[in-house]
Amino acid sequence: MKKRCIYQFLLVCISSCFLACNGYLEEIPQNKQKLTSTDDYEQLLNKAYLTEAVLPYIDLLTDDISYIVADRDPRFGNVADSYLGAYMWDNNIESTMPNGDEVFGKFYNSIYYTNVVIDEVDQAVGISSNKEETERIRGYLKGEAYALRAFRYLYLVNMYAPPYDPATSSTTPGIPINLETSADDKPYTREMLDKVYEQIVDDLKKAIPLMEENYVNVKKNRFSPIAAKALLARVYLICKNGI
């Protein structure tokens, strides 16, 4: 009888352990924050903007920057020389950079954040009791995420793919397109150039009405409906009305 009671006690303990383990596995990992409110998604979108830190290096590829070695400020040492390859349009500009070419990785990280906002913000809880205001904020954030994603892809395709030519765009490799939020480690193939630009245009066409119909006054460093329209016009100019 005593042994039977012990067995029953052990069985209860083991069952409790399994139940506890199941509950533990259902918990959100400590290194992953669960987004619930519109404010949470706005903060994530702000993080997607932070990759602007790599844009000064991109400016070196344009005519906006001049670099005169004789006038170099000695206080900065040879820091500017690290990016001289970009300024000179060397074939291997990453070789002199202290951290290599960061644009590709940082911009795809930014795209991942915009994907999360686009997929999930419709279920976000408002920080106020005003339902109409919550709906408006959701809509604007979603539109803003579409615009920012298009902006990132436009930069990437212009940096890592040949120029757009309507005659050859359907057979010219462009860049990978990722519209998912899963963290699966899988290879991505390069889409053809016309598909990349079609995705950019599609994102902007979704972004503009969402931001116009749900207008929210945001800081100047974030996308507005006018900025999205200007970006769409630029895309059409690049494509020479071939898309």
Question: Which residue stretches match the model-derived regions?
Answer:
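Membrane-proximal, proline-rich intrinsically disordered regions
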Residues: 21-70
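Short coil/linker segments at helix-helix boundaries
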Residues: 127-136, 159-194, 198
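Aromatic-residue-lined binding/catalytic grooves and analogous aromatic/hydrophobic interfacial grooves
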Residues: 21-22, 226, 231, 235-243
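Bacterial Sec-dependent N-terminal signal peptides
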Residues: 1-31
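Conserved, well-structured interaction surfaces
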Residues: 83-160, 191, 209-212
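Short coil/turn linking the two alpha-helices of tandem helical-hairpin repeats
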Residues: 157-164, 215, 238-242
